[in-house]
Amino acid sequence: MSAIPTQHGSGPAWKSGQIARLGTALDSLCGALVAIDKQYGEIIALRRAVCESARALGKRRPHMTEVAHLLEATFALTAPAHLSMARRLAVEMRCILEQAIARLRELPDADTSRESSCRIVGSAMADLVHHCDENAVALSKLLGNAEHEIQVLQALFVELSGP
């Protein structure tokens, strides 16, 4: 969600530009929501597979039973709540963007012809897009961390499943 320069001006074209700007941010946010859901599911499935592999290995090597218990306890304490919280915040941001777009659409074109109205609304839109950009950076980092966790879990699963 990179910032699109604030459009100056007034009238219906200005209003359309603001709506397009918010629509771009909304599309990006929806893509992040899909990625969060995918990674959350992947992490849960991999954690389950790692625990099952560790338990199976514990049957052949009794000392690995303790490792299985440790993994289960660690996973229980470190549930991917960070992804759940990020998803909730992203859903809230999506609602805010959808409301902003709806309000802009309801704004009479006559009101967009006044420079003072455009300046006030434009300033609010710039703040909103700025916060969207900040959230996008945070979501990108979070998704990167989730991807790293997935890679570590995959490697651990392979290690535990080996001979």
Positions of PLM-derived features:
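Long, low-complexity or tandemly repetitive, helically biased scaffold regions used
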Residues: 3-163
